[in-house]
Each structure stands twice: as structure tokens, then as C-alpha cells.
């Protein structure tokens, strides 16, 4: 059996550009793409923390080291400059890979979209 699992996440990135008339996509700083194991043209889901919008597009390379998160084409209507977003990608993983310890790549950024940390799991949520 295959399970559709979280593969990659860039958590709380800041939208730096909205380019309505650019060919549709989301340009992401190459450093972030590599850290999160997202490749060019891979489908990504974007969840806007500020307004609750959730949409899908595909990733393209943004200038390395720029901190760029550019929503392009119709995606530009889903956020404003400065909005916080979560960018996620998923993969089909078989049971054997899961049993062998398969883990996602989770990347955490600061307010300039510089990497401040990473890990391979989401902590258990508690009521404290």
C-alpha cells in the first residue's frame, strides 16, 4: 500500500513578491528548495497563515540567498506581501519505506526567509 505523506515543508515563510502577470508558479530561494528537498516543477501546496487560503501550484527556482518567496500568476491573488505561508510537498511512500524510518524534511525560517533550523518530524501536540 502507498500512503501520501508530507515530504517537505518550509514553515512560516514570508511572501516577498506577488507577480500577477508572471507565468504561474511560486519562485523559492534555491537554498530553501534544497534544504526542503523540493525540486523545480514539483507540485507544492501553499497555506496562507494570514488569511486561511490554501492552494496548489508548482515550484521554480528563485535567486539563491535572496530569501525570495514569489507568488506568480493567479497565486498572486491569494496573498499579500508580508503574509506568512507554509509551503508543503507530498510523496507516495510505501509501507516498507515507512517501516524503514522514512522521514520528511522540515525547514524553519526567520522573518527574512533565512534558514534558522530543520528537523525530520512534527512534535506531538499537547494541551499544555
Swiss-Prot record:
Q: In which pathway does it act?
A: Cofactor biosynthesis; (R)-pantothenate biosynthesis; beta-alanine from L-aspartate: step 1/1
- List cellular component terms (GO): cytosol
> Quick one: which residues bind substrate?
57, 73-75
- Tell me which UniProt keywords the record has, alphabetically: Autocatalytic cleavage, Cytoplasm, Decarboxylase, Lyase, Pantothenate biosynthesis, Pyruvate, Schiff base, Zymogen
Enzyme class, spelled out:
lyase
A Pfam family the protein falls into:
Asp_decarbox
**Cofactor binding, note field:** Binds 1 pyruvoyl group covalently per subunit.
Instruction: State the reactions this protein catalyses.
Output: L-aspartate + H(+) = beta-alanine + CO2
Q: Which residues carry this modification: Pyruvic acid (Ser)?
A: 25
Task: Report what the Swiss-Prot or TrEMBL entry states about this protein's PTMs.
Answer: Is synthesized initially as an inactive proenzyme, which is activated by self-cleavage at a specific serine bond to produce a beta-subunit with a hydroxyl group at its C-terminus and an alpha-subunit with a pyruvoyl group at its N-terminus.
Specify whether Acetylation is a keyword of the entry. no
Q: Which cofactor does it need?
A: pyruvate
Biological process GO terms, please?
alanine biosynthetic process; pantothenate biosynthetic process
Annotated EC: 4.1.1.11
InterPro entries recorded: Asp_de-COase-like_dom_sf (IPR009010), Asp_decarbox (IPR003190)
Q: What does this protein do?
A: Catalyzes the pyruvoyl-dependent decarboxylation of aspartate to produce beta-alanine.
Q: Quaternary structure per UniProt?
A: Heterooctamer of four alpha and four beta subunits.
What is the protein named?
A: Aspartate 1-decarboxylase
| Lineage summary | Bacteria, Pseudomonadati, Pseudomonadota, Betaproteobacteria, Burkholderiales
Amino acid at each position: 500500500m502507498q500512503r501520501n505523506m508530507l515530504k517537505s515543508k518550509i514553515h512560516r515563510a514570508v511572501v516577498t513578491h506577488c507577480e500577477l502577470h508572471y507565468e504561474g508558479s511560486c519562485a523559492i530561494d534555491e537554498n530553501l528548495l534544497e534544504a526542503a528537498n523540493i525540486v523545480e516543477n514539483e507540485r507544492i501546496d501553499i497555506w496562507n497563515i494570514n488569511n486561511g487560503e490554501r492552494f496548489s501550484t508548482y515550484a521554480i527556482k528563485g535567486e539563491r540567498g535572496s530569501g525570495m518567496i514569489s507568488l506568480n500568476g493567479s497565486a498572486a491573488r491569494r496573498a499579500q506581501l508580508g503574509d506568512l505561508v507554509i509551503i508543503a510537498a507530498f510523496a507516495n511512500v510505501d509501507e516498507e519505506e515507512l517501516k524503514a524510518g522514512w522521514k520528511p524534511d522540515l525547514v524553519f525560517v526567520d522573518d527574512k526567509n533565512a534558514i534558522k533550523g530543520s528537523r525530520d518530524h512534527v512534535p506531538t501536540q499537547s494541551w499544555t
